[in-house]
Amino acid sequence: MGGNTIGKMFSVTTWGESHGKAIGAVIDGCPAGLPLSEEDLLVELSLRRPGRRFTTPRREPDVPEILSGVFNGKTTGMPISIIIRNRDVISSYYEKIKETPRPGHADLAYIKKYGYEHWDYRGGGRASGRETAARVAAGAVAKKLLGCLGVVVSGYVVELGGVEFPSAEDAEESLRSRLSPFRVLCCEEKAEEVLKEALERRDSVGGVVEAVAWNAPAGLGEPVFDKLKADLAKAMMSIPASVGFEVGWGFKLARLRGSEARDKIVSSAGEATVEGDKAGGMLGGISVGAPIRIRVAFKPTSSIMIPEKTVNIHTLEETEVEVPGRHDPAIVLRAVSVVESMFAIVLVDHAIRAGLLNPVRVEWGPHCQRVWELYADRVP
């Protein structure tokens, strides 16, 4: 089975299932010399961790263990292996519905591809959002590496259940979402109202995450098939429950005239740059030195307490299923950290390919540490 690895020069492979013994990631291509500890990984994992208000009540501590690739507190240039053990597993919930694939989930697709007898029905198995904890652990490594370039990657919710929330104008503002349980920049009472209503209806809501790479350098991305926006699209659409991807103004540009849809090219600080973010900081799929802005849409959580039509996979008799278990009323809240992580992983891969990051060894200085502290100082 392929499809478990992303990246060329800086690659991340995730492994494990929702109700297995553990999940984890193997990072290959991380240069030597990067200070790295399990506490660094926890900085990011704490924002994705389940068990908080308006998230799944499954209480996973998400404590990572670095098994390889780090010596005397710094990366060695060898593969970094990370394991996160599953602690709060209740597989009995799924015994009642293992013969009735859940509507909206990957159950039916996995059954058709791998066969019913090989399908791990417990909590969604490999297709579960639980897998994304491994991505966030790897994303912490990528974010630290980007600090060497002065790049900050931050995301926030701009839409929840059809209610819109503001975007950020700078890195400092965007990082405020890290302290919000709803991952919004303001108006938390509006977000809480949306989620309370969904819970009262025994339903769920979707949303949109916006993420920005601030101080991104020019030259990330290759022509044609390895464009930066193409790799970002692949990374974002690989996240469970993602259903749409935009760069800059995205689909809005399709409704404008050419005279309205272009970013101006101006002279600023002794160089040519773009004014505006309609193109999302990329032209021809290559970064131009402006902030790179993307959006990812997430569907509502499919596991809800409202019955839906399905079939018994053995008899093919139509029936209804009401999904038990512990689930998020809005997966988009915890998806923010996953979007940031995948964003950072893709940027590091392209930075190494572009020669902007040394693939063998990095020199960690005070400027790198200052960038990392922007994340570490904003943990709830």
From Swiss-Prot:
Is Lipoprotein among the key words of this record? no
* Classification via HAMAP family: Chorismate_synth
GO CC terms on record? cytosol
What UniProt keywords apply to this chain's record, in alphabetical order?
Amino-acid biosynthesis, Aromatic amino acid biosynthesis, FAD, Flavoprotein, FMN, Lyase, NADP
Query: Which cofactors is this protein said to need?
Result: FMNH2
What species is given as this protein's source?
Ignicoccus hospitalis (strain KIN4/I / DSM 18386 / JCM 14125)
Task: Kindly list any coiled-coil regions of this protein.
Answer: none
Q: Which family does it belong to?
A: Belongs to the chorismate synthase family.
State the protein's name. Answer: Chorismate synthase
Q: What class of enzyme is it?
A: lyase
What residues bind FMN, as annotated? R126, A127, S128, G284, K299, P300, T301, S302, S303, R326
